[in-house]
């Protein structure tokens, strides 16, 4: 299978227009990606720190910023037919882009190990399974979760069409039961916060929940049939989908002191629903996660063998889960998550400023081994994010983009207006 075969999802080239998808398909895949268990814990922190009305305002503002960021990258993905790692060749250089490949790839394989282990451990705990059986489940899940990613976009799409509506029904059921338990909306509005967070920290928490995922959502928005599809699907996935996960976590923390919807469903007496939610929630994110790894790996190795890289990544992630390294990886993965957003800032500045909104065809572009303004801007953005007291990921994006525009302008490195691509 060649890298231009539709079944291989064009890992090293633009997605042609005949392979593009509509809004329902793209939005459903992104919702499957953003329906992520870990996001609920951020909501749990908000639920005990604000009144219900203030909490809703934080969730709306934080997720709107996240959705707009994803939509900006999604628009570029539609226009170019490229994903973030391929865009990285333009802003970081042919060799320099391997830095972003490593960062994005390592983050995803680590989260794959975490998700695989989490599914096995939770089921093992619920059914009181011995350690050997839990390890066996890790192997089973590690291979099972990658099956839809192995198929490609079509596999992710099919699972999302099944998982997303099912999860929505379970979430609505859980929220209805929780609302009744707390005394209706009047009860929610009367809840007194037991903790405290300032708005800056709260927005940082919400925006940072999935900003690394938003940076890599171009893997699917590049399949968009139009700019409208790319932008709306991004907003649906990250403003609505991620926002719902944060809200569910907050609901659980307010009513049950437990942000994880799986645990909440168990407390509500819906044991089978809880197990279904666990598997659907993790699987619909895991397959996207390993797909992200495969895309980054293909660009790193300059290979079109996406399916082979997918399987290799699943094996590595499963081994990390079996070795218990997923527990040790989480702090480093969160750390890496803070250095991913500046990549998006450089990409947007490079596309809109340097390339004036139109990349040349990747196969025809003469790119340097290292694009030092891009690499330097990324470094500035990362340092700014680490030292910022306010919405660190957003500061990292803005600092990286602004630095790139200034340096590129000073060096006179803007391109002439590029001709439109025929995708």
Regions found by a protein language model. Give the residues of each.
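Hydrophobic transmembrane alpha-helices that form the core helical bundles
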Residues: 97-131, 283-299
């Amino acid at each position: 299978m060649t890298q231009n075969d539709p079944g291989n999802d064009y890992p090293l080239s633009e997605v042609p227009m005949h392979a593009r998808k509509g809004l329902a398909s793209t939005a459903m895949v992104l919702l499957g990606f953003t329906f992520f268990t870990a996001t609920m814990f951020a909501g749990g922190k908000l639920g005990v720190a604000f009144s219900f009305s203030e909490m809703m305002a934080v969730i709306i503002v934080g997720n709107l910023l996240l959705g707009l960021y994803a939509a900006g990258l999604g628009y570029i993905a539609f226009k170019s037919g490229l994903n973030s790692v391929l865009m990285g060749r333009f802003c970081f250089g042919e060799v320099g882009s391997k830095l972003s490949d490593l960062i994005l790839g390592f983050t995803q394989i680590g989260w794959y190990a975490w998700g695989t282990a989490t599914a096995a451990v939770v089921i093992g705990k619920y059914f009181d399974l011995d350690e050997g059986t839990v390890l066996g489940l890790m192997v089973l899940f590690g291979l099972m979760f990658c099956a839809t990613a192995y198929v490609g976009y079509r596999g992710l799409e099919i699972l999302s069409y099944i998982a997303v509506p099912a999860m929505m029904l379970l979430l609505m059921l859980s929220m209805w039961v929780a609302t009744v338990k707390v005394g209706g909306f009047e009860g929610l509005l009367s809840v007194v916060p037991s903790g405290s967070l300032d708005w800056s920290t709260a927005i940082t928490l919400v925006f940072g929940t999935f900003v690394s995922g938003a940076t890599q959502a171009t893997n699917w928005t590049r399949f968009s049939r139009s700019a409208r599809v790319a932008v709306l699907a991004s907003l649906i996935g990250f403003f609505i989908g991620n926002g719902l996960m944060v809200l569910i976590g907050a609901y659980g923390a307010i009513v049950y002191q437990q942000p994880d919807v799986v645990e909440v469903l168990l407390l509500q007496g819906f044991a089978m629903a809880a197990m279904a939610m666990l598997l659907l929630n993790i699987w619909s994110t895991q397959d996207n996660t390993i797909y992200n790894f495969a895309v980054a790996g293909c660009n790193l190795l300059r290979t079109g063998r996406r399916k082979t890289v997918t399987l290799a990544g699943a094996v590595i992630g499963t081994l990390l889960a079996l070795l218990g390294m997923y527990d040790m990886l989480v702090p480093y993965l969160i750390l890496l998550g803070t250095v991913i957003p500046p990549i998006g800032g450089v990409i947007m500045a490079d596309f809109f400023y340097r390339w004036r909104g139109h990349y040349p065809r990747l196969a025809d572009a003469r790119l340097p081994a290292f694009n030092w303004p891009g690499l330097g801007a990324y470094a500035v953005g990362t340092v700014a994010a680490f030292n910022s007291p306010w919405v660190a990921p957003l500061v990292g994006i803005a600092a990286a983009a602004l630095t790139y525009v200034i340096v590129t302008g000073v060096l006179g490195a803007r391109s002439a207006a590029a001709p439109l691509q025929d995708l």
